[in-house]
A protein has these predicted regions:
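Short acidic active-site motifs
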Residues: 21, 45, 64-66, 87, ...
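Short acidic alpha-helix that forms the nucleotide-activated donor recognition element
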Residues: 62-74, 94
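Conserved catalytic-core segment of nucleotide-activated headgroup transferases in glycan assembly
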Residues: 1-48
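Acidic donor-binding loop of glycosyltransferase active sites
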Residues: 71-84, 97
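Short alpha-helical segment that forms part of, or immediately flanks, the ligand-binding pocket
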Residues: 67, 86-94, 108
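Short glycine-rich donor-binding/catalytic loop of glycosyltransferases
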Residues: 81, 97-108
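Nucleotide-activated donor-binding/catalytic signature segment of Leloir-type glycosyltransferases, i.e.
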Residues: 44-61
């Protein structure tokens, strides 16, 4: 399978380690730097991802830190299960930056581009 050559920075803001199709996305978007951010400690499942060259783990505890990530990142991946964290989807929408989600992780109808979780390649090659 061909690799996508898109470059840039993506944000995933979560409070859980249940992130849909994460391994597939990391493998197939090697030129994207993924900032996985959380206001909590990372589980071992997520912690081991820091060894990947295109993953940055960030603990966020203030609105200023989140605003910095919104400004820095090119798009948001709304692919975390459970609740939306700190209204991150609306922050990206207000910043006029794209938000991509899966059908089983989308947080409300806030203008996200939604893909079937069973076909992650559609998101990757978007």
């Amino acid at each position: 399978m061909r690799k996508n050559t898109v470059r840039g920075d993506a944000l995933i803001l979560t409070v859980s380690d249940q992130i849909e199709q994460l391994e597939y996305i990391l493998e197939n978007l090697p030129d994207i730097c993924f900032h996985i951010a959380a206001p909590v400690h990372f589980s071992e499942k997520i912690g081991v991802l820091e060894s990947k060259y295109n993953v940055r783990l960030v603990t966020v505890t203030t609105d200023q830190q989140i605003d910095f990530l919104v400004n820095m990142c090119d798009f948001l991946l709304d692919i975390n299960h459970f609740q939306e964290v700190d209204a991150i989807v609306s922050r990206f929408v207000q910043a006029e930056k794209p938000v991509f989600a899966f059908d089983n992780t989308v947080h409300g109808n806030q203008g996200q581009e939604v893909f079937l979780s069973s076909t992650p390649d559609k998101l990757v090659f978007r």
